[in-house]
């Protein structure tokens, strides 16, 4: 996924009300940008962090700039929660995720479960349907260890239960964690942030839900889905 125009560098002043970020650009210009991330963004809100913004010329937008990347712990972190689904859609079209390659079609936002919409439904005439949920990961508290979630994630826990129900019916069910960081080489659930999610992930992984974790290649011009990363469901990735 290429950014539509070169990103603009600045420094974060503050992030507030979840969706707003005050930034000072490298040329000294202060501005308020849209922050496309409703989560806690632990470790990514620190004033003074270098950040990268995209700019839109759409006159209907209230804020022309969007916070896209933050430099933290020596690496780049993608904070836009819309990107993982776009990255996965791009990778599916290219057959770049071997574990779910070979399906004739994929549809997005298909209703299932308890009034939910699955991110992707993969279909082919010669194999069971594949229900695929995508989760964005940007938390790192120990060197190299990506964690999810960074706050209580009741909706994500419900998605795991719904995937397990699809697996019980004989379909494939997959949860794909997309790690939008360049400094992580493994993944574990953050049990201290949400013990129910961590327990549910371990449970559904034993009940037929496939767990995939992929890293990302990130720079100021583009984001690409990277290589698969190892994972475990121990939830022991808490800081000492």
Swiss-Prot record:
Which ranges of the sequence are coiled-coil?
none
| CDD domains found in the cross-reference section | SfsA-like_bacterial
Q: Which Pfam families is this protein grouped with?
A: SfsA, SfsA_N
Q: Which InterPro entries does this one have?
A: SfsA (IPR005224), SfsA_C (IPR040452), SfsA_N (IPR041465)
Q: Name one GO molecular function term.
A: DNA binding
Q: State the family it belongs to.
A: Belongs to the SfsA family.
Name of the protein this chain belongs to: Sugar fermentation stimulation protein homolog
